Design a protein with these regions (language model features):
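Class I S-adenosyl-L-methionine-dependent methyltransferase catalytic core
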Residues: 1-232
Length: 232
């Protein structure tokens, strides 16, 4: 059936997401599948994102979604329910559409303010009037919110994985996955010191003010005229 399909649209078990997407790519299929947001950092998935072979779909950019489950499925999770016909549903957080079908939303440029304007006008108290930090062990800017990315910063930035919801491949270049130890080593990121309790010795980027490792960061930078259209 897979070999005969032109486009695959499905909701595979999240536990098999890595293997299933790899199979679709291996067979050269166009696809639209539901998966967990955390799949961004999977070692088998991130290279596809970085190489511009996998991206987010048009809908589902936040919150959770409701899914029908079999009659035998236990309803232990919060938000689960049974409708008037006895059909069971659960709500799942952090789900997204994953696809290799191009769409217009993917090429919408993210509107941004300059660093100075972010510090002055940002809606985020962590940025407004405070500014940005550079990691203790890596020369990159910590950007805690996607809409706080400075438009005029040319260096590498660490952003939340939810950045991919707004990612325009013509506007930004994805450099590395902060959860990938090998990529961090290749970038020259040394292990964190003992003051980073719980992450000492790990190749994570450290935030000086909190003495904590930044949670699940993607490293990006603005595309320049020289890199626009250039894919790795």
């Amino acid at each position: 059936m897979l070999k005969q399909a032109d486009i695959v649209v499905t909701n595979p078990p999240f536990s098999l997401f890595r293997e299933y997407v790899a199979q679709l790519v291996e067979h050269g299929k166009k696809f639209l599948v539901i998966g967990n947001m955390q799949a961004i950092t999977y070692n088998e998935v991130f290279p596809l994102i970085k190489a511009d072979k996998l991206w987010m779909g048009v809908t589902i950019h936040s919150g959770d979604r409701e899914f029908r489950v079999p009659d035998y499925y236990p309803l232990n999770a919060a938000g689960s329910r049974v409708d008037e016909n006895g059909v069971k549903y659960i709500r799942v957080k952090g789900v997204r559409w994953w696809t290799n079908l191009d769409h217009g939303r993917r090429h919408e440029k993210l509107p941004l303010m300059t660093m100075a304007d972010n510090i002055k006008f940002s809606k985020h108290k962590e940025v407004r009037g405070i500014g940005y930090e550079t990691y203790c062990n890596f020369d990159a800017l910590e950007v805690p919110f996607t809409d706080a990315i400075p438009s005029d910063f040319d260096g590498i930035m660490g952003v939340p994985i939810t950045f991919l919801d707004k990612y325009d491949p013509d506007q930004f270049e994805i450099i590395a996955n902060g959860d990938d130890r090998d990529e961090m080593e290749a970038l020259g990121v040394p292990p964190l010191g003992p003051e980073y309790v719980g992450n000492a010795g790990r190749r994570k980027v450290g935030v000086p003010s909190t003495k904590k490792a930044a949670y699940k960061r993607l490293f990006i930078r603005h595309r320049t005229k020289a890199t626009k259209g250039k894919k790795k």
